[in-house]
């Protein structure tokens, strides 16, 4: 986030997380203090002329706050409802000021790209969906949990190879992709690549 802040001329960033995740909030708060003590945050980032600070904010956990303008309303202490666009947050966002809104996946990709280069990052994935993505596998599977993989694996590979198939040994009839507002994919669509464009086509 500090890199993104310096790149855009921002001096402060906010990490917005749901109040239902106290361990994540505590971990992030500790990480901010460590970064501040190491000079990565503060009035002179890494000894440079750039200042950047991070504040952790917790929200009430409304699902709609995953949408950027609703998130901004919540950050401002308002009800988490979607704002009309335009104006876009890049022009008029948090407290009416130009605002960059990124998810943690985008921000986590920045150091890898800066260290290894864009071509290295582009080697992972397919089409317009490049790099890696964290996926959570839950339910009747042998190996549930959080995994990081490149875009492009099929749903079948994710369920059968990474997840190990079902814990009960019964055949998989369908999987839900994308959380509460996602879609169900039957077994006959398990050849679908884990890729934004491929999902949009299905």
Kindly give the residue locations of the regions a language model identified.
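Short amphipathic, charge-patterned alpha-helical segments
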Residues: 2-4, 150-168
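Hydrophobic alpha-helical positions that pack around
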Residues: 25-151, 163-166
């Amino acid at each position: 986030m500090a890199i993104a802040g310096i790149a855009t001329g921002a001096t402060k960033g906010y990490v917005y997380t749901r109040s239902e995740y106290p361990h994540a909030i505590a971990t992030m708060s500790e990480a901010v203090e460590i970064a501040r003590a190491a000079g990565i945050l503060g009035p002179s980032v890494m000894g440079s002329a750039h200042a950047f600070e991070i504040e952790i904010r917790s929200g009430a956990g409304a699902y709609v706050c995953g949408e950027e303008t609703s998130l901004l309303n919540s950050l401002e202490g308002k009800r988490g409802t979607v704002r009309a666009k335009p104006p876009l947050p890049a022009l008029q966002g948090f407290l009416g000021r130009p605002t960059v809104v990124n998810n943690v996946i985008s921000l986590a990709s920045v150091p890898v790209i800066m260290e290894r280069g864009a071509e290295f990052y582009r080697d992972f994935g397919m089409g317009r969906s490049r790099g890696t993505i964290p996926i959570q596998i839950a339910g009747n599977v042998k190996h549930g949990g959080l995994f990081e993989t490149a875009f492009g694996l099929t749903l079948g590979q994710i369920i059968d190879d990474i997840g190990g198939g079902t814990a009960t040994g019964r055949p998989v009839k369908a999987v839900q992709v994308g959380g509460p507002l996602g879609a169900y994919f039957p077994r006959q669509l398990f050849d679908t690549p884990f890729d934004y464009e491929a999902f949009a086509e299905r």
